[in-house]
């Protein structure tokens, strides 16, 4: 790939996390670009594919688009892909209070990364990672979205309480990025 791979995001924290997880041996040059994409509704896979194709048209080249869901089991998967708006209106405290009337506090964090070569005739490829856990009252720093209220299974710290290095070993984003890295190193010629 002679052109750089554009990671479409305006979220500096997300970019920093992805670059850290990819490490120095990723075979493509990753650059970020903020692109005004439509906010779509639907299933996460469909949203990612459509956003990725639109981003590839705008950038006129290879792109990555990432979308994150936080699915509460008690609410049938909501907020799901709409977590951004729930978080903007409610904050981490409000997210945890959404489950006040339910015994089931379990949730799944899902990261879906979509890749397009830039060719509109080629399929978009998806890489998805999931981490299960539960929603708790916010603990830890408030610098990265809903991290303060997500407690991954098997841990006694929320994402926000963990050192970045620990979170980056187990997170939903890490699982998706590792699948992306494998695809790029094994399937594509760089």
Swiss-Prot record:
Source taxonomy: Eukaryota, Metazoa, Ecdysozoa, Arthropoda, Hexapoda
Main localization of the protein described in the UniProt heading: cytoplasm
The protein, known as: Inosine triphosphate pyrophosphatase
Any Gene Ontology CC annotation: cytoplasm
EC number in record: 3.6.1.66
Biological processes annotated in GO: deoxyribonucleoside triphosphate catabolic process; nucleotide metabolic process
Sorted UniProt keywords: Cytoplasm, Hydrolase, Magnesium, Manganese, Metal-binding, Nucleotide metabolism, Nucleotide-binding
SUPFAM superfamilies hit by this protein: ITPase-like
Binding site for ITP: 9-14, 51, 67-68, 84, 144-147, 167, 172-173
Originating organism: Pediculus humanus subsp. corporis
Binding site for Mg(2+): 39
